[in-house]
Amino acid sequence: MNITLFFVALIIALILNYIFKKKNFFLSLTGDVHQKFASSSNVPLSGGVILTLSSFCYLNNFDNFIFVLLTFSIFFLGFLSDINKINSAKLRLILQILIIFGIVYFSSILIFSTKIILLDYFLENNIFQIIFTVFCILIIINGCNFVDGINTSLIGYCIIISLALCYLDLKGVETSQLINFYNLIPILMALFILNFFNKLYLGDSGSYLLGLLFSLYLIDTHQINNNISPFFIICLLWYPAFENLFSIFRKIQFSRSPVNPDTNHLHQLIFFHIKKIFSFNNFYLNTFTGIIINFYNLISIIIAVQFYGDTKVQILIIIFNITFYTLIYVNLISKKIKKSQILSKK
């Protein structure tokens, strides 16, 4: 790991945090309910700013001006959301679609094969290919934003994926050159430490940017190397993807807007459940919840990376993850509903 880069990122983050708190600007209390449900502290949403300022260290595509401009447009959109300049979830969604479409169109980073016969037939059409790619990236970006509600959850998850990709690189497996993960990991580690101690959040700006970069990298990797199963890519991104898709379906089921945040995501239910068991400060419970989730995902990805080219194994891992997620969710939401019903009768 690049120790120098780690300390530089850490120092810059501390300086920015001091400035933001001094100016009472860009703090977590300006965020949505999914950002502050476990904490009422004035924590700077500076993670995305750090990732953007340090991007020249880990992004390898700066020669493509339009690509870089559009990529950082997603950060700026998240930034405007964080400071409540764009409060409409629908408007943010429309702008996300336009930005992602531009990136996909100008970079030619497209999903062309899934090993699902019917879907691959439609993907032979270029227009459908673009629409499907935009949809998938959109799901990941917003899924990353959802899971960022718990300390270390998204940053830790991205570190795990980064380590898995470095492992493939060390084994000589051909992957995308879009991101230098050997430089990104120390930056993420610096953010992880501050996030662990509740001193920094990614905010919408950071979660949007990470979701976009990891999506583009993994799609590009599969374009470059067909020996990597497309289901391995899904395995790496299953958690934010399924979190978002599951959230959309459950909100529609209960006649709620899919684009509005709430506190019924799995990580939030786990937090509330742990809170009932342990009478600790919310800060400790928040971080502990993120560690539990990341430990599970670490085991899942360690297994998946050993069989990166075996589609059958990847499908089994995905099915197990989704089944386990659903069972845990149903159990915890049932307890929450039951408790609400009991309280309403009093």
Walk through the language-model features, giving the residues of each.
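Extended hydrophobic-aromatic, low-complexity segments
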Residues: N226-F231, I248, N260-P261, K312-I315
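Membrane-helix cytosolic exit motif
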Residues: F242-F254, I328-K336
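Membrane-interface starts of transmembrane alpha-helices
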Residues: S88-R92, N125, G203, N281-I292, ...
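Transmembrane helix-loop junctions in multi-pass membrane proteins
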Residues: N195-F196, T221, F246, A304-D310
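"…together with the soluble PPM/PP2C metallo-phosphatase catalytic core" -> "…together
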Residues: M1-A241
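Cytosolic, membrane-interface loops and tails of multi-pass inner-membrane proteins
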Residues: Y18-P44, K85, F246-F283
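Alpha-helical transmembrane segments and their membrane-interface junctions
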Residues: S54-L59, N286-Y308
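Alpha-helical transmembrane segments and their immediate juxtamembrane interface regions
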Residues: F76-L80, K85, R92, G309-K346
